Every structure is written in C-alpha cells, then in structure tokens.
C-alpha cells in the first residue's frame, strides 16, 4: 500500500490507494478546498486519480503556475459547454492553453458576432456559478469513439483515429451534459473557473492546413482571482495604447501595404531611428572587435542543399530562377559568412574571427501570422558569427554575454531571463564534445553572475545554445538574443584552418544575435517607450519655434547652430499660436521644444520645454547645445533636469 512523500519530506502511510484529493483532505479541509490537481512523481494528475504505489506528491493549487494553466484549460471546456448549449450543432475541434489564456476552435454554421461572443461569455458565467463537479472517466478507445460519433463530433473522432492508439484509454471530462476529451488534468469543480473573459475571434484552419476547412477560433483569458484578471485587462489596455502600429502611424515612422505583405516601407523618421540603431550597434561591434561584412541576399539553391536548409526550411524560403539556375533569397546570413571565411587559407593565429552583418533576410511567413514590425517577411538581422577553436569557446561566449547585457542596458531593459538549451536525443558529435560545450556555456554564464535555467534536450542537433529573453515595462517577454554553438555548418561547407600541429581542422562557429530583427526591435522599443524615444534615438530631437514673425531670423540662426552641432532639429515658423505648436510637437513626442520670443532674442537665450510638459526656463543657447550633446552622446534615457 502506498507511502506518500510530501514536498517537506514528511510521509503518510495508507492501506489503500489514495488520490491527491484524499491526501489533501487528510492534511486539512482548507487544503482540500484549494486542491486543483496533484504532481505525482513529477507528473501532473487529476485530483481524483488514484495513487497505488509509493510516490512523491505535491498538491497543486491556484497559487501554482500549473494550477493556473489547469484553470485555463478547464475554461476552454467551459466554453465548449456553453457554446453547445447556445448552438447545439457546433462541432468542437481543439481547445488548448496559450499564454495568458486559452482558445477553442469550433465549426459553426454562423459567423460569430460581438453580440454572440458576449452571449457566450454570459452563458459561461452562468454555468461556472453553478459550481458543478467535473467528472473524469477513463474509457476504452472504442467507447470514446462511439461517444463522439453519437454526438456528431467529427473532429474528436478524427483526433481519436489519427492521434490516439487503439490500446490507449482516453480521459473523458463530463461537464454536466457536455463531454470533452483531454489528457488533463482539469479542475475538480467549476468554482475555480469564475474569473475569465472572452477576448476575440479569428479564423483558423483545421490542423493548421490551408487545404482544410476554416474554423472559428475563440480566444479567452482566465485567472485565479478577480484582481489578477483586472490587472491583466489593464495591462492589455495599456499595451493597446502603446501598440507600435498605432504609434508608427501617429509619428509617421513606416507603413505596410497589401502589395508587399510583411515588408516595411520606412518613412524618413522611422528610417532615422533604424540608422541610429545601426550606428549604436556598429559602435559596439568596434568595441568588441568585430569586422563588418556584407553578403549577397540571394545564392544558388545548391548551397542551401549543402547546408541542409533546403531539406528543412524550403517552405519558408523565397526562390527565383535565372538562366536555368534556381536561387534562394537568404532566410539567414550564416552560410554567406562561411563563404567569406573560406576565402584564403586560415591559420589558428587568425582565430577567433568575429564577423558581423546587418543582413537583409526574407522568410515566407504565413500571411495570417504577420503583425506590424513584430512579424515580417523582410527583415534585417544584427547577425554575427564567430569562428574559433574549441579552446576559445568559453572566452568568446563570455564576451558575447557581456555584449548582450551592455547593449540591453542602454535601452533600460533590466529583467532578462536566460535559458541554456542542452543536447537533444538526435545530435551530431561525441558526448565528450557536448560535455565540454555545455560546460563552457554554463561557466561563461556563472562567471558573469547570471542566473539561468536549463532547457534539457532543447538544443539544436548541431550544438547547445543560450537564449536571452527580455521583459518590457508591461512584463511581456521578448526573446531577442541568442548565442548558439554550431559544430555542423562549418564542416558541411568545408570550412577549415591550419592548427598549431600543421593539420587541417574545422572551426567551431558561434551564431550570435542580440537585437535579433532590427525591425522587430524597433517595434519593441516603440512600445517600451510608447513613442517617447530617448533623445539619441528620436527622429527629431529639437523643434525651434517663434512666437511672432519678428523672431524668424533668430530661429533660423539657432536652427543652423543646432544642426552644426550634430543635433536633429526643425524650425517651426508657421503663423500659428505658440500653444498650438507646442501641443502639436508634444503629440509628435519631440524631446525638446525651444521657444523664441522677443525677450529670448534680446538676451541671446531660448525658453526650453520638454515633451513631458516641463518648463526648464530661459537658458543660454550654448549651454543648451552642450547639455543636449552630452545627453545624446551618452545615449541617456533621461532628459535634462529629470
């Protein structure tokens, strides 16, 4: 009979099989009431599942991350329960958990309107408030199939036929008259599922295949309590205000259009930000001793076959042909960098060789996945590849890590989560090589005092990698930086160097990206700063304005002086009220507005005002220029007098 070991090391002995709920009841009624599921020997199970042998057990409640995921998954079933009551002929497809919520794909003979979604949410609340028990039954494959055939659930039948073995016992979850199929676990009672909201609907092909029927996908969010739900909805509201697509239009940064899906039309001000970002990255490339190169954006398909990209990536590659040869527009820069490395004999004395490129890449992303600057088809990578010996890996990774944090800190990103992905089952190279490589990455992180978590088995077949995920002011995660070891590509493309022993050796290649896609990073920055870019990045840093025509000459002189000092400046001499001009440029998020009236002309000064509405008073022109230059040069996130 089972001995149950709890997380604190204490044990409970039973003379019969017990469920996590039984153990929770044994500990106390308060814990039992809070119990959502259990983790038995590291595996999540339903609160009602029986434990027959000795096991470790952790009780899962709404305070646990897994508990929240289970609540969300059960809310997807609740959605199914409600939609079948409102529209009984609906066919249910799949309803998984996603970030912050859930969705359900449904086959419905009507297009859901906003009023329909509101009615659906209302019915979900009515059902949840009944606090009914969710009943789990493990049944044979044949019984499960018969259940869903009788109910006309063709998609569930297809899942059974195509994805579930005949000797398996699927779990059927009964929500009163509604039945759904799932691995689980799910909440034992609907009292855990009171805090949710349906968010939107979208189209989705069955199994993600455009040859299949288009279904309707209903998205929802769910949380453990009302406070968390409201906080999330508030964050969404703030995120909507910061949406880079909206701000990009307001500030005239860029646009997209149907004739070039996923391709960016940069306007002058947006391109100014792009170029300033390039200047910043180039300064870091120089500091960390990289050489900058430029490869062709299109190469023969034969090369992509050698690299393995054609076999594994061809659906995402744009192709063209000329003179009976097929070419691929590059989706990444690494093969081109190996070609540059291969020009001329390389010695161990030439290593490490650090090669960087602002590489223009194209990937044939599905049109439905495109999203402003965040998901595009044409993008520029701040890409680099380091060719080195195995002995140099640790030092090079160390330098990459320092560079990542150096660059992120410039933008004020302080919360960075780091993950180290280790060897997968299918891989090249010896265990000894992987041992050394993984240890080198781990030690490099430790030497920089960076906490990290392992992602076991998540590395590429050709080497382990470090991923850097930064969190913005709304606590949203953006995976941008990567340091990836590659023991395969140099060999595939015949890269070599002459070692100290005069023998030919294959270099190790380190793929290194920090910002990732420049376009996406500008989208992230736009939302992080809500368009209030730090002065060094702002397209227009200063606007000089007159109050009446009599100050026009002074404004022009001052504008020229600022321009000569390397400051991006515009003069606004329009015959408009000064309040109107200030408001307009404030809405344009121009960092500084310099106002010139008769008093300023007479004193050779200028009245300085920030876009946040702070009046810095009347200041000496040369002092203002000097302070602005210092702010821009230091890439400060703070404005004058902040």
From Swiss-Prot:
GO terms for molecular function: ATP binding; metal ion binding; threonine-tRNA ligase activity; tRNA binding. Keywords: Aminoacyl-tRNA synthetase, ATP-binding, Cytoplasm, Ligase, Metal-binding, Nucleotide-binding, Protein biosynthesis, RNA-binding, tRNA-binding, Zinc. Its cofactor is Zn(2+). Binds 1 zinc ion per subunit. GO terms for biological process: threonyl-tRNA aminoacylation. Pfam families: HGTP_anticodon, TGS, tRNA-synt_2b, tRNA_SAD. Residues 243-534 are annotated as: Catalytic. This is Threonine--tRNA ligase. It comes from Salmonella choleraesuis (strain SC-B67). The lineage of its organism: Bacteria, Pseudomonadati, Pseudomonadota, Gammaproteobacteria, Enterobacterales.
């Amino acid at each position: 009979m089972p001995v149950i070991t709890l997380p604190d090391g204490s044990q409970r002995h039973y003379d019969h099989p017990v469920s996590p709920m039984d153990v929770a009841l044994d500990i106390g009624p308060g814990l039992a009431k809070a119990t959502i599921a259990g983790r038995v020997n590291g595996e999540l199970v339903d609160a009602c599942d029986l434990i027959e042998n000795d096991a470790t057990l952790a009780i899962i409640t709404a305070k646990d991350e897994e508990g929240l995921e289970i609540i969300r998954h059960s809310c997807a079933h609740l959605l199914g329960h409600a939609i079948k009551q409102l529209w009984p002929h609906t066919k249910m497809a799949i309803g998984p958990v996603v970030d912050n919520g859930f969705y359900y794909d449904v086959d419905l003979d009507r297009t859901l309107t906003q009023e329909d979604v509101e009615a659906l949410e209302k019915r979900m609340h009515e059902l949840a408030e009944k606090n009914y028990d969710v009943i789990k039954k493990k049944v044979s494959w044949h019984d499960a199939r018969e259940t869903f055939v009788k109910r006309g659930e063709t998609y569930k039948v297809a899942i059974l036929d195509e994805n579930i073995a005949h000797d398996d016992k699927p779990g059927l979850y009964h929500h009163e008259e509604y039945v759904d199929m799932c691995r689980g676990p799910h909440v034992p009672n609907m009292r855990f599922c009171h805090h949710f909201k349906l968010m939107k609907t979208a189209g989705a092909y069955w199994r993600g295949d455009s040859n299949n029927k288009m279904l309707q996908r209903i998205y929802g969010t769910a949380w453990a309590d009302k406070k968390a739900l409201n906080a999330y909805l508030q964050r969404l509201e703030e995120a909507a205000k910061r949406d880079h697509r909206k701000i990009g239009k307001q500030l005239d940064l860029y646009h997209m259009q149907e004739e070039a899906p996923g391709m960016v039309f940069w306007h002058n001000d947006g391109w100014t930000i792009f170029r300033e970002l390039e200047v910043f990255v180039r300064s870091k490339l120089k500091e960390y001793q990289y050489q900058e190169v430029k490869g062709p954006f299109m190469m023969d398909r034969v090369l992509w076959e050698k690299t393995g990209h054609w076999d594994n990536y061809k659906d995402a590659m744009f192709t063209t042909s000329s003179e009976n040869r097929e070419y691929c527009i590059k989706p990444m820069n690494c093969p081109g960098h190996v070609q540059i490395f291969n020009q001329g004999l390389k010695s161990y004395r030439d290593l490490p060789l650090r090669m960087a490129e602002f590489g223009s890449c194209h990937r044939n992303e599905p049109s439905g996945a495109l999203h402003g600057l965040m998901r595009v088809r044409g993008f520029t990578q701040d890409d680099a590849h380091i060719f080195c010996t195995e002995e140099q890996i640790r030092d090079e990774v160390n330098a990459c890590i320092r560079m990542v944090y150096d660059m992120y800190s410039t933008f004020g990103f302080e919360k960075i989560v780091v993950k180290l992905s280790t060897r997968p089952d299918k891989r090249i190279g010896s265990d000894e090589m992987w041992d050394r490589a993984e240890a080198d990455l781990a030690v490099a992180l430790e030497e920089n005092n960076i906490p990290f978590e392992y992602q076991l088995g998540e590395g590429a077949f050709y080497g382990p990698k470090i991923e850097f995920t930064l969190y913005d002011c709304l606590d949203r995660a953006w995976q941008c930086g990567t340091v990836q070891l590659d023991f395969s590509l140099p060999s595939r493309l015949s890269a070599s160097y002459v070692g100290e022993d005069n023998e030919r050796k294959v270099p190790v290649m380190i793929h290194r990206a920090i910002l990732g896609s420049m376009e996406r990073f500008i989208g992230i920055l736009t939302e992080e700063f809500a368009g209030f870019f730090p002065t060094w990045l702002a397209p227009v840093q200063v606007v000089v304005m007159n109050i009446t025509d009599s100050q026009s000459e002074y404004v022009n002189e001052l504008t020229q002086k600022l321009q000569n000092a390397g400051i991006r400046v515009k003069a606004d001499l329009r015959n408009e009220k000064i309040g109107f001009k200030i408001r307009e440029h404030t809405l344009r998020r121009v960092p500084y507005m310099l106002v010139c009236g008769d008093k300023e002309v007479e004193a050779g000064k200028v009245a300085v005002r920030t876009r946040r509405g702070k009046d810095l008073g009347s200041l000496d022109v040369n002092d203002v220029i000097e302070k602005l230059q210092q702010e821009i040069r230091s890439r400060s996130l703070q404005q004058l007098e902040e």
